[in-house]
């Protein structure tokens, strides 16, 4: 921050926070939090306040834990209890027994030249004491869990440091870049937008039109804010490419890099992209997971796109996910599972030793490894392709979901006898579908709508199935377990669930 004191650090709807102002805010908040404040909850809103909170917590030696204020109250309470949170920045997610620390203010240069908010104060001019160590947690994020309770992943500072250095190089960031902050601040993708940008002297741009649901507004915003780097969920990019192709448009001239990730890229959309793009925009396909700190593999698709002009992709082809970044070790097991090792691997799942032992291990050299659950293949040139999951997990809107978590919640409803949840594709988008056998005496006709309301009161929106179908029975395996895939094949073939209650997923926001 000291290298570029008067350059724009954060731009929000045209208003600018300089690196000097951002530094004052961060230092002031760090002093208010005190030394090593532990896990600190933050209401994850799409504003500069959340960016300041993230950096201030890290500067204080604490661990950032984002909580969406829109989550059901019980979900928020369970999350804070699971991580032992005793401090929150701002009152948006405060619970009984949680200390609330208010954000400092600062002067912000607005579009009309006036100044807004109050001064950070004298505390902001003092350097915060050193409170960091490589194994100290940097942030905690939740992934889907089969018990119905989300699993808190603990990411250490060494993982952030190694990953951010690699990403700055991968993206080719300079102080002249303007990077859109698109991802939800609840999900780890936001860190690959925020941290490489602000450690590289570039400008981070937040704007409500990024999530307006209108592609024309989105594209106008990109041009107005002179965005050079876009990091988008693959599902959102699929829809954007369709819009550009249908309207005969191209991305604004200011865009130089587009990063996609979160789920498999559709070869048909890449063919559309190849027809639209002249090679001006660099397109990176990326792979990673919360447990391995953001992006671990990436590939510049210029080469594959050029090859596809001679031999177009077929429907069954798989788009490569690339090679490991410099800080990442990789192994492929005999059954084809990808294992990630090195400094980017998380500490594990907080308070869940069995789940941690199942996924994480350490070799004789002291290298920490994570079993991804993803099956991969390696091409002769060393590039990996994703071949699917080895377990039942599925991605919805770019967010990894364990269907068993949704099943656990649905099974808690008094009208449900049995349930199977699986992932599928509806109208070209990844989605969850649920098949429910009602208890005797339950009102089957209204159960689907009742269950949708029941879930919305308990889980985030991405865990609510797009389709809930009431069925007389589920398919079982030879051992008597519910066969999710078999139940889906049976009831989708019968046309079940095509009527009321079907709902397509929203565009992916990570």
Predicted regions and their residues:
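Conserved AMP-binding
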Residues: 44-49, 68, 173, 183-190, ...
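AMP-dependent adenylate-forming
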Residues: 1-17, 88-130, 138-141, 160, 282-285, 300-510
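Conserved AMP-binding/adenylate-forming core of the ANL superfamily
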Residues: 6-34, 77, 155-161
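Gly/Ser/Thr-rich phosphate-binding loop
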Residues: 202, 231, 243-315
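Conserved AMP-binding/adenylation subdomain of ANL enzymes
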Residues: 151-178, 188-228
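Conserved pre-ATP/AMP-binding loop-to-beta segment of ANL
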Residues: 124-142, 149, 173-179, 185, ...
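Conserved AMP-binding/adenylate-forming
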Residues: 15, 32-69, 178-183
